[in-house]
Structure formats: C-alpha cells, structure tokens
Amino acid sequence: RRHTRSLCDWSSDVCSSDLEVGHLKYGRQLHFWDFKERKPIETMYLGEDGLVPLEVKFHHNPDSTHGFCGAALSANVIHWWKDKDGKWQWEKIIDVENQPHPDWPIPIPGVMSAILVSMDDKYLYLNNWLHGDMRQYDISDPHKPKLTGQVWMGGLLGRAPKVNGLEIAGGPQMFQLSLDGKRLYVTTSLFSTWDNQFYPNIREKGGVMIMIDCDPVNGGMKINPDFIVNFGEEPNGPSRCHESRYPGGDCTSDIWL
C-alpha cells in the first residue's frame, strides 16, 4: 500500500566461503526503494550495529511503516519507521550479547540468521544459530520489545544438545509460524559451508525439524515433545533442512487485505 521495499546488502561472497567472524568485509546497510516508481529513495548505514543485515520484515498491516531487520553477525534487531515528517528513522532495539566458549579465542556471536513477525504484528521471533536458542518478543510497542519466550535446541553452548531424545547437529535456523500464531516449525541448516564449519557432525547426522508451541495471547514458547523430523534418516540421506512453508499460507507469505 505504501509502495516501499526494503533490501539489505549483507555480503557479496558470504554463501561460498567460511564465516570469518573477525573480518569486516560484510555489509551493514539497508536500502529503501519506491516500488511504484522503481527507484531508490533511502540508504541507512547501520555501522557496527548492523553487521551482515540479513532478514527484513515489515509489519503485516499495510498502513504501518514499521519494520525490522536481523543483523546476523552483530546479533541485533534493527527497527525502522517513518516519522511524522515523512523521514525514515532507525534504532537498535534488541542486542544479543556474545557468549564465551572455552574452545573459541573470542566470544561466540549469536548469528541471528532469521526473524519473523506474527500475523497480528504482536510478536517478533528470532534465532541465535550458534548459541542455540529461539526467542519470542512482544513488539506491541516496536520501540520497546519485551522478551516473552525462549527455548533451546542444539547450538555450541551445550544448553540443549538433545531434543526429544535426538542429538542435534546444528542450531535453530529458519523457522515458519502458522497463521494462528500457535505452531512454529524450526529447522537447523543454514549454508552447507557454514554448517560444515561450525557443526561438522551434520554431515553424518543430517538436519532436524522441531515444532515449538507458542502462546499468541499471553506469550511463551515450549518445544512440542511429540514432534521431531530427523532428516538424517531420509532416503539417500543424510539430508539437511533449511526452509519450510505452509500450503495454505503462513506469516511470511501473507499480509493483511
């Protein structure tokens, strides 16, 4: 309705090489385009708060100018909006701290490779692929998010090496939420090069999909104990799982009408 599209410039060769945490060769800008006129209108430089800006999500409400970006390497969520003067503004609203690890020379970044906004624009979900946790934030006030849920699966911190009896080689990566906001499906593979770099056992074990039960009214998350898909046992496997979609629509493909 507002004919605006947002794009990020996370890197030129990031998919084909190892993730070099100490390098500064990655993108840190957001670009806004007038989709009707097909021309760029704004570029936001995010600096160190926006290293490897990856997923961008607007509110589903087409009258809203609010949107969010997950900066993967900084492990931050950037919030943007248009002010009363029609100018685009941005701020960092979530900052996931790096965590120490005995085998790493530097603290481990979360690597926030995905974000998602619920259909009612009430909750924002994010992952920390290297830490191993999924989070739910109430964004009723998009300037002041509140953490309302957190679960652990895999990751390098050792908080949940097994889920529903299955050892996880990887961490929470892509995820998809049902339109009613109650079922969140999470998979574990990012890119094969990064998978092999940080989770080499995924070559033999394959990927996993779990389901998280979400409370869309009061907030909260818990791993469903009766659901798990082991892609390591697929024919001609082990296989890896990246992204999922709902045939009847989901919170990524649908908007308000």
Language model features: what each stretch is:
Residues 32-39, 79-93, 136-148, 199-201, ...:
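Short loop/turn segments immediately following beta-strands, especially the blade-tip
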Residues 63-65, 120-122, 180-182:
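Short coil/turn segments that connect the beta-strands within blades of beta-propeller domains
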